[in-house]
């Protein structure tokens, strides 16, 4: 259940801070959000898939930590990212 290269590149271009930015918190959070969305859809089709459920929980935890980091370092970027990704906070 991983994202294909084209999807990752598209997300990276949309959320990068500068031309060669591939690892900023914004990009990482956006990629994790897309992956979480795909896993949620998979779990709707396969509710007994416990490995995917655990992977989903792990990804949500990673995203939460990155969001906390971004909020503590740059609150304005955090608020902008939350609104762009339609995350509730």
Curated annotation (Swiss-Prot):
The Gene Ontology biological process annotation of the record reads: translation
The record's section on InterPro entries has: Ribosomal_uS15, Ribosomal_uS15_bac-type, uS15_NS1_RNA-bd_sf
The domain of life for this entry's organism is Bacteria
Q: Name one GO molecular function term.
A: structural constituent of ribosome
Q: Cross-referenced SMART domains, in alphabetical order?
A: Ribosomal_S15
Cellular component per GO?
cytosolic small ribosomal subunit
Any Pfam family matching the protein: Ribosomal_S15
Its job: One of the primary rRNA binding proteins, it binds directly to 16S rRNA where it helps nucleate assembly of the platform of the 30S subunit by binding and bridging several RNA helices of the 16S rRNA. Forms an intersubunit bridge (bridge B4) with the 23S rRNA of the 50S subunit in the ribosome.
Q: Which family does it belong to?
A: Belongs to the universal ribosomal protein uS15 family.
Q: Can you state the subunit structure given in the record?
A: Part of the 30S ribosomal subunit. Forms a bridge to the 50S subunit in the 70S ribosome, contacting the 23S rRNA.
**Per its UniProt record, what PANTHER family does this chain match?**
RIBOSOMAL PROTEIN S15, BACTERIAL AND ORGANELLAR, SMALL RIBOSOMAL SUBUNIT PROTEIN US15M
This protein's name: Small ribosomal subunit protein uS15
What organism is recorded for this protein?
Chlamydia abortus (strain DSM 27085 / S26/3) (Chlamydophila abortus)
Q: Which gene encodes it?
A: rpsO
């Amino acid at each position: 259940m991983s994202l294909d290269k084209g999807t990752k590149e598209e997300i990276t271009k949309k959320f990068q801070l500068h031309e060669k930015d591939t690892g900023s918190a914004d990009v990482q959070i956006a990629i994790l959000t897309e992956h979480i969305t795909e896993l949620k859809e998979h779990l709707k089709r396969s509710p007994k898939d416990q490995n995917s459920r655990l992977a989903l929980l792990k990804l949500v935890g990673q995203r939460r930590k990155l969001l906390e980091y971004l909020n503590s370092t740059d609150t304005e970027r955090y608020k902008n990212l939350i609104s762009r990704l339609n995350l509730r906070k």
